[in-house]
Amino acid sequence: MAKKKKTSQKWKLYEVKGGKVVRKNKFCPRCGPGVFMANHKDRWSCGRCGYTEWKK
């Protein structure tokens, strides 16, 4: 029996404040709007193109 694939859980990337939807993570500057960057302890990284921004 094959293992089940983990879902993307995109609902965790948004929150509602004052009746408006607010994005929690940044978009990738290379891929454009719609592709979120992953928030790590020391960096922001894009899983699609591999772009990385280091935190200071």
Swiss-Prot record:
Cofactors that this protein relies on: Zn(2+)
Record carries keyword Transmembrane helix: no
GO biological process: translation
Keywords associated with the record: Metal-binding, Ribonucleoprotein, Ribosomal protein, Zinc, Zinc-finger
Source organism superkingdom: Archaea
Alphabetized InterPro entries for the sequence: Ribosomal_eS31, Ribosomal_eS31_arc, Ribosomal_eS31_euk-type_sf, Ribosomal_zn-bd
Gene Ontology molecular function terms on file: structural constituent of ribosome; zinc ion binding
A single Gene Ontology CC term: ribonucleoprotein complex
Cofactor binding comment, as recorded: Binds 1 zinc ion per subunit.
Binding site for Zn(2+): 28, 31, 46, 49
SUPFAM superfamilies documented for this protein: Zn-binding ribosomal proteins
Zinc finger (C4-type): 28-49
Residue spans crossing the bilayer: none
Family recorded in the similarity comment: Belongs to the eukaryotic ribosomal protein eS31 family.
Subunit structure, interactors included: Part of the 30S ribosomal subunit.
Name used for this protein in its record: Small ribosomal subunit protein eS31
Originating organism: Thermococcus gammatolerans (strain DSM 15229 / JCM 11827 / EJ3)
Lineage: Archaea, Methanobacteriati, Methanobacteriota, Thermococci, Thermococcales
Gene: rps27ae
